[in-house]
């Protein structure tokens, strides 16, 4: 293959992705307008892998929007995707603790178990069984083209496993088992929703033309800003640059104090030239609702010490109510387990019904 041919292929893929994003953005805006008028007509599925504790990036990137959707009256579901932990990890150590801490943080942030079903992947076998018919609806080439699979494989440093390759199809099972028609996501996760739409469409066309079984879900594209870690890199638990929602005030202060800055005394907001200082300003701006540039102007020549002091005070003030609610909930872990057991029970009822509809459509009821 010549360099020119490779360049043409890269350009074609880029144009295809750009067109796909524009179509998804248009669909997202139209769906949001309908959702505002009739939230009861929408079912949302979202979730997290229990690979560690939730941090500020999770809150501003997704959890805040989940709470808002729930409170609007959208039928809300949150999956704790424990099976998906092993897509790029060789151990399930700490998974019990991680799962329970997710539920604690969800509820402390405002997720109401009476309005939102929280459940774990591994506890809903009928949902996972959908993977078999769904895999027949996609090609190997389509799976290999998924950019999220590529990036996850590169980040993990592992060989490509069958579970990682089929990760997007497993996510389609998560979304479609409860007939979710809206999925709040960031731009990076759009390919997962697109392949879910493809699977739903192909299943209905192949097996259920007269009575479609699955909706084609719309991605609700997040308007949340990308939140950098305290060192200016992407916020990640593995980098140790994240402010955990459940961290104490002292732990938070210690983390912020040791975050890197630069040699310039005057504080300015410049994410490209000064990523580390700008990351601290962005964090302060999010938790206070202020423009990071205004904060930088206010601190001025007072230097990095004054900036870190401001960030510590702002973050701790913002997280204080969350910590208080979390501590109160943590006094009764049996209740937290009951919430999860109840969610698992409800999810099984829904998944069993959906699987029966799938078997009926495929002529596999005996």
Regions found by a protein language model. Name each.
Residues 145-203, 207:
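Internal, conserved structured core segments that host functional sites
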Residues 2-173, 327:
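N-terminal Rossmann-like or analogous alpha/beta NTP/dinucleotide-binding catalytic cores
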Residues 103, 110, 138-142, 180, ...:
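A generic secondary-structure signal for well-formed alpha-helical elements
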């Amino acid at each position: 293959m010549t360099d020119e041919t490779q360049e043409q292929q890269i350009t074609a893929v880029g144009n295809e992705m750009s067109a796909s994003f524009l179509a998804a953005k248009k669909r997202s805006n139209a769906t949001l307008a309908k959702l505002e008028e009739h939230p009861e007509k929408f079912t949302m599925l979202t979730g997290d892998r229990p690979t560690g504790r939730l941090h500020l990036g999770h809150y501003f990137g997704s959890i805040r929007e989940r709470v808002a959707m729930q409170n609007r009256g959208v039928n809300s579901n949150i999956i704790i995707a424990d099976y998906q932990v092993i897509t790029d990890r060789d151990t399930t150590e700490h998974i019990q603790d991680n799962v329970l801490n997710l539920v604690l943080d969800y509820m402390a942030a405002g997720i109401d178990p009476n309005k939102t079903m929280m459940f774990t992947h591994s506890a809903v076998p009928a949902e996972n069984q959908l993977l078999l018919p769904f895999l027949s609806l996609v090609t190997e080439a389509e799976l290999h083209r998924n950019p999220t699979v590529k990036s996850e494989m590169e980040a993990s440093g592992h060989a490509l496993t069958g579970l990682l390759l089929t990760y997007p199809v497993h996510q389609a099972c998560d979304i479609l088992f409860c007939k979710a028609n809206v999925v709040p996501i960031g731009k990076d996760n759009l390919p997962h929703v697109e392949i879910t739409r493809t699977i739903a469409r192909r299943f209905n066309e192949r097996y259920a033309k007269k009575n479609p079984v699955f909706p084609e879900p719309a991605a609700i594209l997040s308007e949340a800003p990308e939140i950098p870690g305290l060192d200016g890199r992407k916020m990640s638990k593995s980098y140790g640059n994240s402010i955990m929602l459940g961290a104490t005030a002292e732990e938070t202060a210690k983390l912020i104090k040791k975050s890197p800055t630069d040699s310039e005394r005057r504080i300015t907001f410049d994410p490209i030239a000064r990523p580390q200082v700008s990351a601290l300003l962005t964090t302060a701006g999010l938790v206070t609702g202020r423009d990071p540039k205004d904060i930088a102007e206010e601190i001025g020549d007072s230097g990095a010490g004054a900036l870190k002091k401001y960030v510590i005070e702002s973050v701790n003030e913002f997280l204080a109510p969350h910590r208080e609610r979390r501590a109160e909930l943590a006094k009764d872990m049996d209740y937290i387990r009951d919430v999860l057991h109840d969610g698992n029970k409800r999810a099984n009822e829904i998944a069993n019904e959906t699987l029966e509809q799938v078997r009926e459509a495929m002529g596999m009821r005996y």
